[in-house]
């Protein structure tokens, strides 16, 4: 066997593994809309889907625009939550959109999987409640009078349908190849933790009915939390994520804390297998790790957004730039606010 043939074979194997990453479907966010999908053939052309996701697409064509919105929601929330960290969820014009970061068993990958699974559940549920989908609507299982005395009415979010679709679509790659590998178990656990960030924070919203604003009758319905709340919950779980390893208990393979002194993780916690890189330098061999050169930093902060940590000890540039702010705002009857535009010079700091 020639060395050239061996190198070519290894390269093809690497590309196959890389392209089969379970989060590749996030590439749907790069599409302006998939609402124009009107037949099953179009599903074959959607980049980033594995074959079993293509089959789900063909059976659920009308749901795919909600999935696309979910993908964009996941990317936007990731970039918001990590805006002040060395890795800030920068995306690529390729699959996977976050690069090789999500192919490693790090806590960053754990966050991406959790927020992605949550985003599909959220977007599909919202599509159900808004009447976009023929296959689902409001949750009619919530009815009657509650123990607190109010009447269940209105449109309760059908979170059960959204979660079920997320489980079938997002989890399909891990389940199709079996659940015996440590990475498959990690991904499935974090997917479920992401969905629980919605389920465990469902809220009750109510409306009063009566004469002159009285509350003689109160009707209530169950609603999902804002997705920013979901992102905040998952980010907190990221900060406290548990490093785990695969262990066989009887005939079952399970993930357990690598440090036996740590308490076992719950279904709501994030877990990871490998330590994260420092993300300081751009690594052309690792797509998705952009480094922190040129990133803005906070000169006075001692946290991760501070120049000392963000710039990894390389120092930073400082320049004065002019910014325009609204100022001297006044309320005018009725009913608008009028502001002046004020210019001022501020110092901006960027990493070397």
Curated annotation (Swiss-Prot):
Transmembrane is among the record's keywords: no
Record's signal peptide: 1-22
Gene Ontology CC, one term: extracellular space
Glycosylation sites: 88, 298
Protein name: Protein Wnt-4a
Highest rank taxon of the organism: Eukaryota
Gene: wnt4a
Keywords: Developmental protein, Disulfide bond, Extracellular matrix, Glycoprotein, Lipoprotein, Secreted, Signal, Wnt signaling pathway
Record PTM text: Palmitoleoylation is required for efficient binding to frizzled receptors. Depalmitoleoylation leads to Wnt signaling pathway inhibition.
Free-text tissue specificity from the UniProt record: Caudal forebrain and neural keel, the floor plate, the gill slit and the developing pronephros.
Transmembrane regions: none
Molecular function GO labels: cytokine activity; frizzled binding
SS bonds (residue pairs): 78-89, 128-136, 138-155, 206-220, 208-215, 280-312, 297-307, 311-351, 327-342, 329-339, 334-335
UniProt keyword annotation of Glycoprotein present: yes
GO term, biological process aspect, one: heart development
Lipidation (O-palmitoleoyl serine): 212
Database matches in CDD domains: Wnt_Wnt4
Function of the molecule: Ligand for members of the frizzled family of seven transmembrane receptors. Plays an important role in embryonic development.
Subcellular location(s) of the protein: Secreted, Extracellular space, Extracellular matrix
Family note: Belongs to the Wnt family.
């Amino acid at each position: 066997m020639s060395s050239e043939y061996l190198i070519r074979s290894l390269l093809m194997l690497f590309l196959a593994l890389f392209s089969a990453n379970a989060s590749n479907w996030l590439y749907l966010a790069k599409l302006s809309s998939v609402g124009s999908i009107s037949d099953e053939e179009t599903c074959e052309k959607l980049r980033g889907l594995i074959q079993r996701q293509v089959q789900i697409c063909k059976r659920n064509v009308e749901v795919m625009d909600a999935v696309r919105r979910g993908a964009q929601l996941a990317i936007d929330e990731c970039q918001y939550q990590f805006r002040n960290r060395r890795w800030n969820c920068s995306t690529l014009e390729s699959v996977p959109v976050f690069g090789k970061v999500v192919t490693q068993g790090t806590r960053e990958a754990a966050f991406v999987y959790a927020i992605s699974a949550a985003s599909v559940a959220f977007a599909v549920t919202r599509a159900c409640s808004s009447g976009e989908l023929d296959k689902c609507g409001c949750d009619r299982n919530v009815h009657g009078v509650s123990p607190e005395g109010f009447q269940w009415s209105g449109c309760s979010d059908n979170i059960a349908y959204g979660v079920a679709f997320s489980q079938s679509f997002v989890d399909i790659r891990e389940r199709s190849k079996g659940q015996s590998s440590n990475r498959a178990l990690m991904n499935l656990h974090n997917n479920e933790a992401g969905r629980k960030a919605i389920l465990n924070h469902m809220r009750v919203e109510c409306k009063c009915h009566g004469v002159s604003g009285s509350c003689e009758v109160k009707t209530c319905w169950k609603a999902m939390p804002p997705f920013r709340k979901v992102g905040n919950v998952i980010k907190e779980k990221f900060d406290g994520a548990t490093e785990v390893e695969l262990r066989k208990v009887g005939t079952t393979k399970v993930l357990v804390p690598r440090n036996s002194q740590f308490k076992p993780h719950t279904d709501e916690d994030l877990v990871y297998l490998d330590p994260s890189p420092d993300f300081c330098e751009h690594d052309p061999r690792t797509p998705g790790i952009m480094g922190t050169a040129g990133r803005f930093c906070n000169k006075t902060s001692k946290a991760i957004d501070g120049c000392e940590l963000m710039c990894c000890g390389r120092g930073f540039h400082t320049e004065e730039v002019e910014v325009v702010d609204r100022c001297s705002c006044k309320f005018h009857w009725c009913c608008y606010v009028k502001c002046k535009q004020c210019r001022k010079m501020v110092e901006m700091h960027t990493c070397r």
